[in-house]
């Protein structure tokens, strides 16, 4: 890593689930990152349904650290409404999402994160105070390393 990690916070962001398995997975990835890069300032958080939520996670990153930048890595397989619209809104960053990109035009899975969301276990009014740069990385996407895992899962179940 060539950049100054002492000035950069890293937030590994999971969707969030009522089941505990998702929390265990994102905790494990966070721990792996910390073990490989001990000087890194890394936290995990959830978009919804679990804590720490995005504001709580950013507040944990910035507490006692003089950060200039936060890199948010959505640990999602692909872009979707959450990574294109909802997460940028929660982070307070500009996005170029066009609602007409929604295929079929009849999306029924509503998320209005600016108000009261019935799935949340936390207060939607929570905020964070960070004046530095927030970068939203791409989700995992198409990657031969993920394809290797897919092949392993098939082989394990033949």
Map each language-model feature to its residues:
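Active-site-proximal alpha-helix that buttresses catalytic centers in soluble enzyme cores
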Residues: 1-158
């Amino acid at each position: 890593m060539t950049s100054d990690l002492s000035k950069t916070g890293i937030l590994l962001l999971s969707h969030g689930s009522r089941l505990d398995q998702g929390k265990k997975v994102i905790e494990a990835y966070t721990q792996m990152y910390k073990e490989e890069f001990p000087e890194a300032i890394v936290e995990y958080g959830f978009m919804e349904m679990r804590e720490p939520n995005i504001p709580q996670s950013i507040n944990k990153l910035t507490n006692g650290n003089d950060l200039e930048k936060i890199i948010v890595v959505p640990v999602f397989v692909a872009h979707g409404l959450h990574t294109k619209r909802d997460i940028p809104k929660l982070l307070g960053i500009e996005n170029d999402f066009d609602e007409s990109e929604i295929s079929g035009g009849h999306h029924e899975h509503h998320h209005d994160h600016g108000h009261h969301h019935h799935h949340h276990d936390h207060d939607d009014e929570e905020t964070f105070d960070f004046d530095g740069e927030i970068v939203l990385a791409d989700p995992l996407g198409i990657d031969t390393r993920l394809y290797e895992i897919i092949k392993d899962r098939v082989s394990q179940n033949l």
